[in-house]
Amino acid sequence: MLLLLLISSAFLLPWAGAGRIIGGKEVKRHSRPYMAYLHIQVLYPSSRKAYSCGGFLIGPDAVLSAAHCVDKNGTVRVTVTLGAHNISVRERSQQRIPVERWVTPPKYSSDGHINDIVLLKLKTKAKINKNVKQIAFSGSNERVTVGTKCSVAGWGWTAVEGRGSDVLMEVELKVQNDEPCKQLFHNYLRHSMMCVGDKKGKKTTYEGDSGGPFVCNQKAYGIVSRGVGTRPFPKVFTRISYFEPWIREQLRKFALQELPGSPSSD
Ligand SMILES: *[C@@H]1O[C@H](CO)[C@@H](O)[C@H](O)[C@H]1NC(C)=O
Ligand SMILES: *[C@@H]1O[C@H](CO)[C@@H](O)[C@H](O)[C@H]1NC(C)=O
């Protein structure tokens, strides 16, 4: 369902991005130096379609995002832009780097967005500077408590009937207990997902802020993963702590150049 939405919006709006932050505000330029903009070019069946996702830098050549962003029917080519604020402009701060390959957990399933996480390996290392920096992510024993307010940024749409934002927007959302997500998503898994959102429905991400980090206390705890149609509440984010050992292992493999070619499922 989400996949179809993503693809159909990509057909209509090649550059608009598959997601939207609603009820947020523009961030101070370069105050989120870990943010990555993913431009995803569909190569098959037609090469004229493209869409975008969010992501975040966790190593000089490593970006985390949502697996469903790169798992489309047909192959895709991914380019990451770091150091961006206004994505419609080629800012001097921007570093545009092609993605060499990526890896998803062996048990990733696009049906229900189970294990919706991907680690992208960049072709060249990013130059770390004041506009481009890594962010730490939560350890396997770290959890944020229900009620904690964390922030999520993206270049998605700013209204349901709106358009993509060219500047980076951010919204604060609360960690919820699992109940609203269990009710709405039959395959909600509390160990690997987190339930997030604004109960009043005034503030939200949509699916194409997909891949962006849910940041609590300067650390990434979640990855924007799924929602239902235009419903603003609740949203399911991938729980990073569950995947921490897997991420560390993949980073070691990146360093050793041992990864199989992408797309891969190891
Ligand atoms: C993927 O695309 C092919 C070719 O267009 C089509 O035959 C197939 O049904 C599609 N699969 C899914 C899951 O949409
Ligand atoms: C982003 O850049 C474009 C192109 O220069 C400009 O038209 C637009 O107003 C800018 N957006 C914002 C919010 O400053």
Regions inferred by a protein language model and the residue ranges of each:
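Active-site substrate-binding loop(s) of clan PA
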Residues: 91, 103-109, 125-165
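Conserved beta-strand elements of beta-rich interaction domains across eukaryotes
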Residues: 43, 62-63, 69-70, 85-87, ...
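Extracellular/periplasmic catalytic domains that process cell-envelope and extracellular macromolecules
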Residues: 27-31, 57, 72-74, 110-113, ...
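Extracytoplasmic
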Residues: 31-33, 73-77, 94, 115-117, ...
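Conserved beta strand-loop-helix elements of the APE1-like EEP
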Residues: 118-124
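Extracellular trypsin-like serine protease catalytic domains
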Residues: 35-45, 148-266
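Conserved H-D interstitial segment of serine endopeptidase catalytic domains
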Residues: 15, 19-21, 38-41, 63-66, ...
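Protease-domain processing segments flanking chymotrypsin-fold serine proteases, especially trypsin-like
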Residues: 1-64, 72, 78-79, 84, ...
